[in-house]
From Swiss-Prot:
GO terms for molecular function: metal ion binding; peptidase activity. Zn(2+) 1 binds at D139, E172. Glycans are attached at N58, N184, N323. It comes from Emericella nidulans (strain FGSC A4 / ATCC 38163 / CBS 112.46 / NRRL 194 / M139) (Aspergillus nidulans). SUPFAM superfamilies: Bacterial exopeptidase dimerisation domain (SSF55031), Zn-dependent exopeptidases (SSF53187). Its EC number is 3.4.17.-. The active site is at E171. It is found in: Secreted. This is Probable carboxypeptidase AN5749. It comes from the Eukaryota. One of its GO terms (cellular component) is extracellular region.
Length: 424
């Protein structure tokens, strides 16, 4: 038996043990959090991933670690370069012993939002209730570790399982990592042009913090920037200038309410599945001093779409701004551009939930799901699932429990099993 299988079996023995089997063979004083983490190959992998800073744009170190780990566990690894300010790459891996090309893809992201927060553990009398903290422990290195372990356990039980792993960069910023993978005809081939490595994916399992629920879909997104040009003057003589701030405020007031206004009255659409479209004015900047009439004003806005397309939402926003400002030519709305030109963003994403045994939910946050091109001819199933809560992701109190991590391995294996049943 080779070392990779032994390692996989070690992971199996930990993560599939019942609560009773893991019960206190040691007293509270005998079991420190460090010893508990050190004793588990799975929790140690999660610790090592979280301990490596990987804020978007600086993912190379964690990518190298993950690539080395997978190679040591009998995976062939491809480091796919991703354009950017620094040299960074996606990690694509498939088992070297698999007799067939991969058709089941497990994927998550290895970048995090800033700032880096060191790994730490809070002890609990029940080992499964131990709380792990640190940047990325929840979003999304919990999913990364659980997907790796689920794949290892599956391969230990079924060495011919046609699995592949993909861990991308830049998900938290613009999705450049997933788009680079999506456009790669060797790693993500079309049905008309199969590659020597991959025939085509039948199932794609995305990892994000979903509280262990299977997600039936998430809202779409549209981002834009509002810029207003005015004319500066002394604040004692404001009529000599033109306040850009006074011009932008009515526009922002209308934009802020678009999700609450019915479509027939010029608002953004809602849906039964996703509720209402929400608008967030995330940044406003104007002027240089309190005693100067501001010559410029800017705002950044993000819209979470409950229905419709980005193009339709763009038209609604432009009409609302024109109406609020009297079609002022000094007011410019610039929308984020898509990778192939045109307006960026995406419509709501509907996902599959046909595997029994999961709670079903929808989420409001965005993912890499729309950045990965799938081919209808392949009859692709797309699942979104993972440990941890989005409510603590990105915050200074980001955390996850051992129980959630362990349950996620079982959940990913259940999804893999369903995917295998579709193939065989």
């Amino acid at each position: 038996m080779n070392l990779s299988i032994l390692a996989a079996l070690a992971l199996v023995s930990f993560s599939t043990a019942s609560t009773e089997q893991q019960s206190p063979l040691f007293s509270h004083a005998d079991r420190s959090p460090k010893s508990i983490i050190d004793a588990s190959p799975f929790l140690s992998l999660h610790r090592d991933l979280v301990s490596i800073p990987s804020v978007s744009g600086n993912e190379s170190a964690v990518g190298e670690f993950l690539a080395s780990f997978l190679e040591s566990h009998n995976f062939n690894v491809i480091k796919q370069p991703v354009e950017g300010r620094t040299s960074r790459f996606n990690v694509f891996a498939y088992p070297s012993s698999a007799p067939s090309k991969p058709s089941i893809l497990l994927t998550s992201h290895i970048d995090t939002v800033p700032p880096f927060i060191p790994y730490s553990v809070q002890y609990s009398d029940n080992e499964r209730d131990i709380v792990i903290s640190g940047r990325g422990c929840d979003d999304a290195k919990g999913s990364v570790a659980a997907q790796v372990v689920a794949a290892l356990e599956t391969l230990a039980e079924n060495p011919s399982a046609p699995l592949a792993l993909l861990f991308v960069v830049d998900e938290e910023v613009g999705g450049a990592g997933m788009r680079a993978f999506s456009f790669n005809t060797t790693l993500n081939p079309s049905p008309d042009s199969p590659s020597s490595l991959v025939d085509g994916y039948k199932t794609i399992i995305f990892g994000e913090p979903t509280d262990l629920a299977l997600v039936s879909g998430h809202k779409g997104m549209l981002s834009f920037h509002v810029h207003v040009t005015g004319k500066s003057s002394h604040s004692g003589y404001p009529w000599l200038g033109e306040s850009a701030l006074s011009t932008i405020l009515p526009a922002l007031s209308v934009i802020d309410k678009l999700g609450d206004i019915p479509v027939e009255k010029g608002g953004l659409p809602s849906s039964e599945k996703y509720g209402r479209t929400t608008v967030n004015i995330g940044r406003v900047e104007a002027g240089v001093a309190g005693n100067v009439v501001p010559a410029a004003a800017d705002a950044d806005v993000t819209v979470r779409l409950a229905a419709g397309t980005p193009e339709e939402a763009m038209d609604i926003v432009l009409a609302a701004v024109a109406n609020a400002t009297g079609d002022n030519p000094h007011v410019v709305v610039k929308f984020a551009e898509g990778p192939n030109g045109g307006v960026g963003g995406y419509a709501p994403q509907d996902l599959d939930t046909d595997v029994p045994g999961f709670e079903i939910t929808t989420v409001n946050y965005g993912t890499d799901v729309p950045n990965l091109k799938v081919y209808e001819e392949n009859d692709v199933k797309r699942y979104l699932y993972g440990p941890g809560s989005i409510h603590v992701a990105h915050g200074d109190h980001e955390s996850i429990t051992v129980a959630q991590l362990e349950e996620a391995v079982k959940g990913y294996k259940k999804l893999i099993t369903a995917a295998l049943e579709r193939i065989y």
